[in-house]
């Protein structure tokens, strides 16, 4: 095993053990700072190997990447933006959405989307994540933001590159690997804070779409450590209501996509 690979493996273990330290406020500021530094170094090191020509060829040969949709394929955009900004979500059209954000776990973070080996699984390809990735266009990466960009080219908030939540390229995609419903309140506050600090976003005027895709780690992992599984369900329900109330209080003109965990695993 190469020395570089050994270092990366150690850092990946730290990533799993200290994931909650990164996603929530804590008193251990020095530990957080050191961990973030190591995590970013490992991330950058691995990202170089994903982007090389050999790995890109493997992705194409294995069918892991979408085939490019030629421009000859029509994409009609008639009647997809309101003449006047709607006051009600019930009259909202695709072109009316100005801002998009994503809250969730590894699926939202785009973990391992371009992986060809186990080491690559730790990379977070947010730019091509289905709910909040906007790299390229729908012809190359069919994501929700890329579809909405056809109707509103000024759409903002989507992630643009392979990145961590610490990177500017993640924008309003704040998904974190291994997150559970208990992480939603903090991630929601982060989204609200980033929106309010973004000069491109008018909180009162712009329509915003926030997608939640979280819960499998609660129901496929955490629930196994509870004597009464109903406690996990009740906790998830309580925290979900909490974040919906927080969004309602802080983000007017917001439509929420709530993607439930699969009924069968």
Q: Which positions does each model-derived feature cover?
A:
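Structural motif
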Residues: 99, 209-211, 255
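Long hydrophobic alpha-helices with heptad-repeat/coiled-coil character
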Residues: 47, 249, 264-265
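Short hydrophobic segments within beta-strands
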Residues: 103-104, 174, 259
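Aromatic-lined glycan-binding groove of carbohydrate-active enzymes
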Residues: 254-265
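Conserved SGNH/GDSL esterase-like catalytic core that processes O-acyl groups on lipids
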Residues: 118-239, 245, 263
């Amino acid at each position: 095993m190469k020395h570089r690979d050994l270092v990366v493996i150690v850092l990946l273990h730290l990533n799993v053990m200290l994931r909650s330290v990164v996603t929530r406020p804590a008193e251990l500021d020095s530990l957080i700072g050191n961990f973030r530094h190591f995590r970013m170094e490992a991330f950058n090191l691995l990202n170089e190997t994903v982007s090389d020509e050999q790995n890109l060829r493997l992705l194409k040969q294995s069918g892991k990447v979408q085939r490019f949709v030629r421009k000859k394929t029509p994409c009609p955009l008639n009647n997809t933006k309101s003449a006047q900004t709607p006051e009600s979500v019930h009259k909202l059209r695709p072109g009316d959405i100005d801002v998009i954000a994503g809250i969730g776990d590894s699926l939202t973070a785009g973990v391992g989307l371009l992986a060809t080996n186990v080491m690559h699984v730790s990379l977070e390809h947010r730019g091509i994540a289905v709910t909040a990735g906007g790299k390229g266009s729908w012809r190359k990466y069919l994501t929700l933001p890329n579809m909405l960009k056809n109707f509103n080219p000024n759409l903002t908030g989507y992630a643009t590159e392979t990145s961590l939540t610490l990177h500017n390229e993640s924008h309003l995609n704040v998904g974190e690997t291994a997150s559970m419903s208990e992480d939603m309140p903090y991630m929601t506050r982060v989204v609200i804070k980033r929106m309010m600090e973004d000069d491109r976003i008018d909180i009162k005027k712009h329509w915003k779409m926030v997608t939640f895709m979280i819960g499998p780690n609660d129901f496929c992992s955490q629930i196994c450590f509870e004597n009464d599984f109903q406690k996990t369900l009740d906790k998830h329900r309580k925290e979900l209501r909490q974040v919906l109330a927080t969004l309602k209080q802080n983000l007017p003109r917001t439509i929420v996509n709530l993607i439930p965990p699969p009924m069968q695993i």
